[in-house]
Amino acid sequence: MKSFEKIKYKRLTILYFLFFIISSCKFNQSYFPHKEGKQIIYEVFFQDKENKKSNFRQSFYFFPRMENAIPVLKNDGELTFYVVQKNGIEKKSIDEFMSTGISNTKSEKNVDLLIAFPISTGTEWETNDKTTLQMKLGYDRIYNTNLPFKLTNKITEVNKTISIKGKKIKNCIKISSYGKTSYNPGPPLDNINIEVFSTSWFAKDYGLVKYKREEKSDSETMGKIIYEKTMLISD
């Protein structure tokens, strides 16, 4: 009788554990739009090192889900995949996605994670990134830096309320990120230090609702740039 009770207890424990995993998976997936044919539009603001400002829009079309992946088409023709894994939600290019397959897309490290699990304050991970600052020498020599660096990401809030054009979005995840690198172009210039700060807000059933990024250097040849994008929310 005692052995029967032990078996029953173990089965209940396993069922509870499976229920927890499934519930968590559904909870985590809700931070990205999953409706077939869903289109999302962002207003984008950019300020370059010369303090010139520009505004434009980006649109993203969500295709039907493929097992644990969501294909997304950007208005410039770029196709990417948001992949839900045990360790978080990854963003992959079509080449990365096709080389690993639909159900076997987990990275060896967290280099592609947009959101890491568990979704709780203090969760931290590193991703690969590149600088987008430009170096300007004189009037006609402009160089893209494209310097690789490690970006440290941390969930700082999980129930943040933000306002987008008067509409309150509750229970947002706030992710704060920081990275730094340096570059030595050679004489007569000294070593140039670059810092990158970014903040992302994700909301249930919306996905990324707001994003801010600032790259700054300690050299006038690079200066700093500011990039922001905000989702247009109609519903």
What are these regions (language model features)?
Residues K2-I14:
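Bacterial N-terminal signal peptides that target proteins for export
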Residues F17-K26:
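Hydrophobic h-region of N-terminal signal peptides that target proteins for export
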Residues K26-D235:
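Conserved functional acidic sites
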Residues K6-Y9, S24, M222:
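Intrinsically disordered, low-complexity sequence elements enriched in Ser/Thr/Gly/Pro
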